[in-house]
Amino acid sequence: MKKDIAFQFALAGSIMTIIFIIVVNSLSTTYPWFIYPTFALLLWPIGVFCAKKKNHKLLSIVYSLIIIAFLVTENYIQTPEYPWFLYALPPLLCWPVLAILDKHSKKVSTAILCSASIIGYYIMLNLILSPQHPWAIYPAFAVLWWPLALYHGKTRTFYAFSISGSLLVIAFFAAVNAITTPDHIWAVYPIFCILWWPLSMYYYGFKKKKIA
């Protein structure tokens, strides 16, 4: 019963506040600033309702749709000539997808499929919206850690993870160096630092066993 009262209070409070903000906005200025507090207020009753039902899947779906709608609105108001909201779609859509997949979301195959889809999406976006610079390598670098960490975490191959992770970092910095400033070789500095990761794993793990 208390949860019902909490939801009713959240719903009534949100509606009253949104109406008040819209009225104040219409009386003070022509700029629709009311959308910012309205966006936050809409999350309140929805969060309370989903918590009551213990339905995290519904929460992820509705929250993602509201955030996407907010970004589309903000994009249309501020810079309608450039659809920047498209950059935020993959992580926002991944949330409900992984929530719906439930236990299957922990599989390495799911991580590989989702990562490949996200990377492919950003490559396509890169080629269509801004082909001048291959910026897709940045989100690709971040996303590749997902299946990599999941696989080595499940197999408990931590030393192999340090090697494969180091190779990924080395490849990333080498690519960024070659693309942005090919006449100045600066990638050796972060590469030197990352090499300490597998080196320390080797001496701490394997050498420790030999000493024991």
Language-model features: where?
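Membrane-proximal helix-loop-helix units in multi-pass membrane proteins
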Residues: 83-122, 127-145, 149
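Membrane-helix interface and helix-disruption motif detector
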Residues: 23-38, 74-90, 125-140, 179-189
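Alpha-helical transmembrane segments and their membrane-interface exit regions
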Residues: 40-48, 90-99, 141-150, 192-202
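Membrane-interface capping segments at transmembrane-helix boundaries
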Residues: 202-212
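Alpha-helical membrane-embedding segments
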Residues: 65-79, 96-101, 119-130, 147-152, ...
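Alpha-helical transmembrane segments
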Residues: 8-20, 61-69, 113-121, 167-171
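Cytoplasmic-side transmembrane-helix entry/capping segments in multi-pass membrane proteins
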Residues: 57-65, 87, 108-116, 160-164
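N-terminal membrane topogenic signal
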Residues: 1-12, 55-59, 106-107
